[in-house]
């Protein structure tokens, strides 16, 4: 996954005349701040046999780039027919390449097929030799971009953040959600166990209540509380008695006089 990702590309004027400029509405997403601008470029492939006939129709620097979703319109000039091997090479199918680079490093390229046809001429019924003999009138040539089927190629580059990982994004807090779900399940199990224990205790109390009468229940409760209080009182009394015994023992013990040497 790249820091900059193209979300959509809309061809605004399609079909159009060969001499009309290209117009693209580009929407992309930026995940982190960028120090430099993005360089967008549109290239026209003038010949299928040699890259020397490729034409850079236009370049555009876009920046500064804020984090989030951004949209702009990229307009590029039409190809220069004087730079083509032959004028007849205008006709037929060719390719345009929309690319983006960061600090001279290309990281994405979108390719489109383009079909150029001249009015009153059916190229499908002609072979290559016949097409090369056609006297081309640029004012009658129309282009049609196959915008529905772009070919996207991505390249890994070094961004500003050296710690940025191009691997697919990990779902945030996935482990925490699993831990929370497990904790909730454990709490539910503990609650169910606690309710079961309470029910068992209530059943035991109910059995005891059934064996005795109401007066007996009240007497038992009172005795239990009195016994607890008595136990506490006995402990305090024992502590007081032990303290008094120690004090009386200290008083009864005669003082030892130090021996004197004669």
Curated annotation (Swiss-Prot):
UniProt-annotated location(s): Nucleus
Protein name: Histone chaperone cia1
GO molecular function term, any single one: histone chaperone activity
Gene Ontology BP, a term: nucleosome assembly
Subunit structure: Interacts with histone H3 and histone H4.
Gene name of the record: cia1
GO CC, alphabetical: chromatin; nucleus
Biased composition (Basic and acidic residues): 250-262
Keywords: Chaperone, Chromatin regulator, Coiled coil, Nucleus, Transcription, Transcription regulation
SUPFAM superfamilies named in the record: ASF1-like
Coiled coil: 173-196, 223-253
Superkingdom field: Eukaryota
PANTHER family cross-referenced by the UniProt entry: ANTI-SILENCING PROTEIN 1, HISTONE CHAPERONE ASF1
Family designation: Belongs to the ASF1 family.
Feature: compositional bias, Acidic residues: 173-219, 226-242
Pfam families (UniProt xref): ASF1_hist_chap
Residue segments, region Disordered: 157-262
Protein task: Histone chaperone that facilitates histone deposition and histone exchange and removal during nucleosome assembly and disassembly.
Entries under InterPro entries matching the protein: ASF1-like, ASF1-like_sf, Hist_deposition_Asf1
Origin organism lineage: Eukaryota, Fungi, Dikarya, Ascomycota, Taphrinomycotina
């Amino acid at each position: 996954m790249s820091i900059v990702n193209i979300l959509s590309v809309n061809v605004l004027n399609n079909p159009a005349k060969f001499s009309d400029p290209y117009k693209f509405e580009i929407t992309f997403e930026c995940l982190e701040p960028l120090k430099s601008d993005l360089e967008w470029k549109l290239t026209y492939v003038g010949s299928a046999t040699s890259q020397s006939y490729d034409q850079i129709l236009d370049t555009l620097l876009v920046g500064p780039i804020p984090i989030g979703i951004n949209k702009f319109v990229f307009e590029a000039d039409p190809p220069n027919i004087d730079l083509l091997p032959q004028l007849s090479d205008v006709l037929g199918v060719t390719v345009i390449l929309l690319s983006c680079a960061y600090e001279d490093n290309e990281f994405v390229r979108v390719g489109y097929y383009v079909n150029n046809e001249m009015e009153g001429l059916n190229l499908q019924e002609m072979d290559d030799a016949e097409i090369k003999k056609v006297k081309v009138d640029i004012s009658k040539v129309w282009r049609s971009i196959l915008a529905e089927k772009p070919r996207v190629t991505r390249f890994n580059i070094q961004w500003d953040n050296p710690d940025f990982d191009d691997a697919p994004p990990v779902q945030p807090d996935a482990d925490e959600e699993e831990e929370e779900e497990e904790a909730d399940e454990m709490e539910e199990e503990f609650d169910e166990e606690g309710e079961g224990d309470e029910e068992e205790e209530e059943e035991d109390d109910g059995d005891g209540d059934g064996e005795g009468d109401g007066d007996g229940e009240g007497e038992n409760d009172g005795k239990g509380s009195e016994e607890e209080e008595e136990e506490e009182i006995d402990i305090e009394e024992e502590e007081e008695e032990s303290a008094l015994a120690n004090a009386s023992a200290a008083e009864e013990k005669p003082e030892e006089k130090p021996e004197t040497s004669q």
